[in-house]
A protein has these predicted regions:
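Acidic (Asp/Glu-rich) sequence patches and key acidic residues
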Residues: 1-184
Length: 184
């Protein structure tokens, strides 16, 4: 259980009789090197790719909830390329702040032992008011930690890496749609 998050890209590949040959798409789906018997390439309309998967990166979930067009309440969001560019910019800004931030130790609930809560020390970033304005942790049932710590930073770094690669791809034609989906 927990917050599972997916960024997907759908590319429109339907062929029309009025399209010139150089604009036609060719789709092949193979399994074990053999054409898949239940998929008719002539009927394929979209190709859907998983751009990124996150696990309990609640600050990213909160960003999508607050900055994109909601399709299903708190679960599915429609995105434009510009949304990904903005998320990338925000992540870079947060990473820059964290690169110069000091750390401190904080006690948090570590779990239960003999029927009682116990506390553990965790290292967190200090003086992170700016980070809280840009990408604050988002609370939710099984959403993960609300600390600005090294795990938070790793989620930001991985998001930057994936979004930079995605946004570096050429814009070809039309028909590319992005969608964010979360479940918990």
């Amino acid at each position: 259980m927990g917050l599972d998050m997916y960024l997907s890209k759908k590319t429109y590949v339907k062929n029309w009789s009025h399209q010139p040959a150089e604009e036609q798409h060719s789709v092949e789906v193979k399994r074990g090197g053999v054409l898949h018997q239940t998929i008719n390439p002539e009927k394929v309309t979209y190709i859907t790719e998983e751009v990124m998967y996150w696990r309990k990166a609640n600050q990213i979930h909160g960003w999508f909830c607050n900055n994109t067009r909601e399709l299903v309440d708190n679960v599915r969001y429609e995105l434009e390329r510009e949304d990904l560019e903005k998320l990338l910019s925000d992540c870079k800004q947060v990473l820059e702040i964290l690169s110069t931030a000091t750390k401190t130790t904080k006690q948090v609930v570590g779990g239960w032992k003999n029927g009682e809560e116990y506390l553990v020390d965790v290292e967190v970033y200090d003086n992170i008011d700016e980070v809280m304005e840009i990408l604050p942790p988002t609370q939710g049932f099984f959403f993960g930690s609300e600390n600005i710590d090294d795990y938070y930073k790793q989620d930001i770094e991985e998001t930057i890496k994936v979004l930079q690669a995605e946004l570096a791809l050429p814009i070809v034609g039309y028909g590319v749609e992005y969608e964010y989906y979360a479940s918990w």
